[in-house]
C-alpha cells in the first residue's frame, strides 16, 4: 500500500492539518506526483486491478535481480478530508485510488476518527455509497467505534484495516476490540 494523507482541521482546532479541503486536496496531489515520479524512474508501479497485480507478480517471478524490479503498490487515502466533493473521489479513482479510510484523528468532514465519537454524517454515508459504486475498499482503521459499526452495517464493499493493534493489548480507542476484529473477519 502507498498512502496519500492530508487532513482538514477547522480553524481553532489544535490538531495539525490544512484549514481548507482544497489545500488538503492539493497536498494529496503533490504526493501523487511523487508516486508518479517513482513510476517514471522505474522504482514503483501502481497496481489498479487484478490484471495489473498478476502482471506484477509474474515480473517478480522472473530471474531479474530484485533491486532491478519496481515495487508494486495499491494507492490508498488515509482520511477523506481532502476529498472536496464526491466528484473528487471519482477523479482519484481515475488516477488509481483503490482504498479509502474515511477517518483519521478527531472530527472529520465525513466521519469522526480516533479520540472522537459519533456516527457518520450524511456526507460520510454518501461517500461510502460512492466508494461502493466505484469498488473502492473501505479502510476501517481510524473509524471511531460508533462510525465503525455504522459503516459495517451500511457498506457492502470490501473492508480491511490497514494498521491496527488489539485493544486487549493496547487499551486505546484507536485499536480494535475483539468484536470489531470478528466483524471484519
Where are these regions (language model features)?
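Active-site core of metal-dependent hydrolases
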Residues: 102-183
Amino acid at each position: 500500500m502507498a498512502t496519500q494523507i492530508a487532513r482538514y482541521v477547522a480553524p481553532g482546532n489544535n490538531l495539525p492539518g490544512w484549514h481548507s479541503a482544497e489545500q488538503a486536496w492539493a497536498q494529496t496531489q503533490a504526493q501523487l506526483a511523487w508516486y508518479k515520479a517513482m513510476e517514471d524512474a522505474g522504482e514503483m508501479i501502481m497496481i489498479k486491478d487484478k490484471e495489473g497485480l498478476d502482471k506484477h507478480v509474474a515480473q517478480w517471478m522472473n530471474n531479474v535481480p530484485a533491486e532491478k524490479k519496481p515495487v508494486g503498490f495499491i494507492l490508498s487515502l488515509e482520511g477523506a478530508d481532502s476529498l472536496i466533493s464526491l466528484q473528487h473521489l471519482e477523479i482519484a479513482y481515475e488516477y488509481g485510488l483503490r482504498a479509502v479510510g474515511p477517518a483519521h484523528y478527531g472530527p472529520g468532514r465525513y466521519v469522526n476518527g480516533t479520540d472522537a465519537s459519533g456516527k457518520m454524517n450524511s456526507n460520510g454515508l454518501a461517500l461510502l455509497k460512492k466508494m461502493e459504486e466505484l469498488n473502492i475498499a473501505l479502510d476501517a482503521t481510524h473509524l471511531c467505534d460508533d462510525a465503525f459499526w455504522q459503516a459495517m452495517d451500511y457498506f457492502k464493499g470490501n473492508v480491511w484495516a490497514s494498521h491496527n493493534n488489539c485493544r486487549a493489548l493496547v487499551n486505546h480507542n484507536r485499536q480494535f476490540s475483539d468484536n470489531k476484529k470478528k466483524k471484519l473477519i
